[in-house]
UniProtKB/Swiss-Prot annotation:
Species of provenance: Listeria innocua serovar 6a (strain ATCC BAA-680 / CLIP 11262)
Catalytic reactions on record: tRNA(Trp) + L-tryptophan + ATP = L-tryptophyl-tRNA(Trp) + AMP + diphosphate + H(+)
Binding site for L-tryptophan: D133
Primary localization: cytoplasm
UniProt name for this protein: Tryptophan--tRNA ligase
Gene3D superfamilies: HUPs, Tyrosyl-Transfer RNA Synthetase
GO biological process, one term: tryptophanyl-tRNA aminoacylation
Molecular function GO labels: ATP binding; tryptophan-tRNA ligase activity
Residue positions of motif 'KMSKS' region: 193-197
Length: 331
């Protein structure tokens, strides 16, 4: 029996090369080995204010990108969170089994609420919904970045608490972090993670950036004054970040890349890297635009929601029975 992978991405902002290398690129590889559920978590997105038309546009766009990067709907399940009602229902049950202190300690809540006068309750109770997303599918592995590990730890705590207190129904999920490429850094400030929400657009390469923009961003990426192309994350974070991108896209080891560019300068290296990134993303963009307005995309999402609901509803029913919700029917 295959192990289960669950992964969710919010449909907010354009996806970056960092999202692709850190998560999306691996999705096509996972689907042959695991039972994969890929969820567009639009209910998470509304924990902060959203424009309703833009949110729907970004949700569809993200679904098309999932398929464009190689997700096969015959092998993996792609669906939209809000189209499977069990997520919100299970989240409420888990919310009643989590403590306020646990939620207030979440680093992401502290970061997003810091200095803001009006913070939604949804931002505080985000973790139980994330836990529901994962636990409904009896998930074994959750591919996440380092910044999400705290949420997975809370998910495990909630699963263990529910199993002991109510009913032993949840599989304990494990964090799965790819060994390389899990953390692509900002092009202008390589001490920070590349982010789709960064105000400075030069910091990130977006998956739908045109070729000229990609080349310009890579050529202007921060390096250092040594001119030597070698990996040293502490002393040469900019070059190290570019080497990581090169390595993940080509499959070459960083040592081989370093050897290839002995005696060459940053200009040659950046030019070559830019062309590699352009070639990689042009293929994705072509497939993306073919899917975006197609009836096929709607059919794939409908089928994905139906399959996800069948699995999730089984777990939800066990949760409801475990806490005593609903009624026991008489004959």
């Amino acid at each position: 029996m295959k192990k289960v992978i669950f992964s969710g991405i919010q449909p907010s902002g354009q996806l970056t090369l960092g999202n692709y290398i850190g998560a999306l690129k691996q999705f096509g590889q996972f689907q042959d080995e695991y039972e994969c559920f890929y969820c567009i978590v639009d209910e998470h997105a509304i924990t902060v204010p959203q424009d309703r038309l833009k949110l729907r546009e970004q949700t569809r766009s993200l679904a098309a990108l999932y398929l464009a990067v190689g997700l096969d709907p015959e092998k993996a399940t792609l669906f939209i969170q809000s189209e499977v009602a069990a997520h919100a229902q299970a989240a409420w049950i888990l919310q009643c089994n989590v403590y306020i202190g646990e939620l207030e300690r979440m680093t992401q809540f502290k970061d997003k609420s810091d200095g803001k006068a009006g913070v939604s309750a949804g931002l505080l109770t985000y973790p139980p919904l994330m836990a529901a997303d994962i636990l409904l599918y009896q998930t074994n592995l959750v591919p996440v970045g380092e910044d999400q590990k705290q949420h997975i730890e809370l998910t495990r705590d909630l699963a263990e608490r529910f199993n002991k207190k109510h009913a032993d129904i949840f599989t304990m999920p494990e964090v799965f972090i790819p060994k390389q490429g899990a953390r692509v850094m900002s092009l202008q400030d390589p001490t920070k993670k590349m982010s789709k929400s960064d105000a400075n657009l030069k910091n990130a390469i977006f998956l739908l950036d045109p070729p000229a923009t990609i080349r310009k961003k890579i050529k202007s990426a921060v390096t250092d004054s040594s001119g030597i192309i070698e990996y040293n994350k502490e002393e040469k974070p900019g070059v190290s970040n570019l080497l990581t991108i090169y390595s993940v896209i080509t499959g070459e080891t960083i040592a081989n890349i370093e050897e290839k560019y002995v005696g060459k300068g940053y200009g040659d290296f950046k030019t070559d890297l830019a062309e590699l990134v352009v070639a990689e993303l042009e293929q994705i963009q072509e497939r993306y635009y073919a899917y975006l307005e197609s009836e096929e995309l709607d059919n794939i999402l409908d089928a994905g929601a139906e399959k996800a609901a069948r699995v999730a509803n089984k777990t939800l029913k066990k949760m409801e029975n475990g806490v005593g919700l609903g009624r026991k029917r008489r004959k």
